Amino acid sequence: MDLDKIGAETRQILQDVLDKASLDEGDVFVLGLSSSEVMGGHIGRNSSLEVGQVIVKTVLDILEEKGIFLAVQGCEHLNRALVVERSLAKKKDLEIVNVLPTLHAGGSGQLAAFQYMKDPVEVEFIVAQAGLDIGDTAIGMHVKHVQIPIRPKLKSVGAAHVTALASRPKLIGGSRAAYREDKIRKD
């Protein structure tokens, strides 16, 4: 597998998603990834630490530059818990749980997050403003309502299908109400 190509595809997709998601400094972005799917395998069966490292490092570098927090979702064996910076967990009053990810419980993305984040911890739940799902890992449970699908121009990283979500405030009040412009659906 060409790791440079995986990094370039990740960078292109992330930039596309960020351009459409209208995130602000301090927002949270969730990343779900299956390195097995990126390499053409079945989710959870063929994890690659190197693939996870390239993807997480690429995403983390871009988000940190913009002041956006990264939350890396783990696999079902950790109940899709997330690796975040301790500072975010404290700021958002998230309950920190005691588990260390492994390649087959948490996955390559979480191992990479523990490697590249300054002070990583695991939390069970978060409410992110947007996210990227590489390999159909089901990130929706961690993105706030109302979720808006984002269709990146590039549809895959390696062999893995890619989807993305942003969010917007709920529209309440019915036909008599007036609303602010929706930055996500401005087209």
Swiss-Prot record:
<dbReference type="Pfam" id="PF04260">
    <property type="entry name" value="DUF436"/>
</dbReference>
<comment type="similarity">
    <text>Belongs to the UPF0340 family.</text>
</comment>
<dbReference type="InterPro" id="IPR006340">
    <property type="entry name" value="DUF436"/>
</dbReference>
<protein>
    <recommendedName>
        <fullName>UPF0340 protein SGO_0411</fullName>
    </recommendedName>
</protein>
<dbReference type="InterPro" id="IPR028345">
    <property type="entry name" value="Antibiotic_NAT-like"/>
</dbReference>
